[in-house]
């Protein structure tokens, strides 16, 4: 797909650096307002991006896999922090827009379809630890609805059976939705399922994001 001139200039000229800085300033401003208003979930985009970047820096995986591209804001934010990005989007319009947005980046790989169906094929080709940002769920508006409101258990099945599963880092958005309704397991059910496969992992919820991965020395000290 041909890269639009706007995105080509953003990618190859100093204007792109300024545009990125301006976007980050706008997002930080919204985040500060959210904090001042009481920090009621969900976490704003800038906050989510900073969480993912933090874990990319701590664990240093070469690959990030995202389920739920939406408008590509997470992909755009983490580009400087990881070598390869794979992102899956169910909605055809969002997928097409993302392909145009990232057409000039050889290290960004976009896929259309249900993440529970597409993710196994991606993982089959990647024989190394990944950070997985799991955000593929129906949330109204322009988001697409698949057979299930969330494919999280399908995703878990293929992720935890991957040869490098023990070294993956999983960040799952919208922890508040894990109530046992609308195809979501409860947090307790999800924790039990994950730790049955990876008993040496931590499982914690903070800022509406489930964070589960191998224990670090800092985790053992807590």
Each model region followed by its residue ranges:
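A short alpha-helical cap/connector motif
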Residues: 1-131, 137-222
């Amino acid at each position: 797909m041909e890269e639009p001139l706007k995105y080509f200039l953003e990618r190859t000229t100093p204007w792109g650096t300024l545009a990125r800085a301006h976007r980050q300033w706008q997002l930080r401003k919204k985040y500060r307002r959210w904090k001042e208003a009481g920090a009621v979930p969900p976490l704003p985009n800038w906050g989510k991006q900073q969480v993912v970047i933090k874990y990319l820096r701590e664990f240093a995986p070469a690959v990030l896999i995202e389920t739920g591209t939406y408008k590509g804001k997470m992909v755009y934010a983490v580009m400087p922090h990881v070598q390869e990005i794979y992102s899956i989007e169910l909605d055809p319009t969002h997928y097409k827009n993302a392909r145009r947005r990232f057409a000039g980046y050889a290290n960004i790989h976009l896929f259309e379809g249900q993440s529970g169906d597409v993710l196994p094929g991606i993982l089959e080709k990647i024989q190394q630890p990944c950070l997985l940002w799991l955000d593929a769920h129906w949330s109204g508006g322009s988001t697409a609805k698949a057979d299930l409101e969330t494919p999280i258990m399908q995703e878990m099945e293929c992720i935890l059976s991957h040869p490098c599963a023990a070294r993956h880092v999983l960040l799952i958005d919208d922890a508040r939705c894990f109530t046992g309704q609308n195809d979501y397991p409860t947090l307790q059910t999800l924790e039990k399922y994950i730790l049955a496969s990876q008993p040496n992992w931590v499982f914690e919820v903070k800022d509406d994001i489930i964070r589960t991965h191998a224990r670090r020395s800092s985790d053992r000290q807590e």
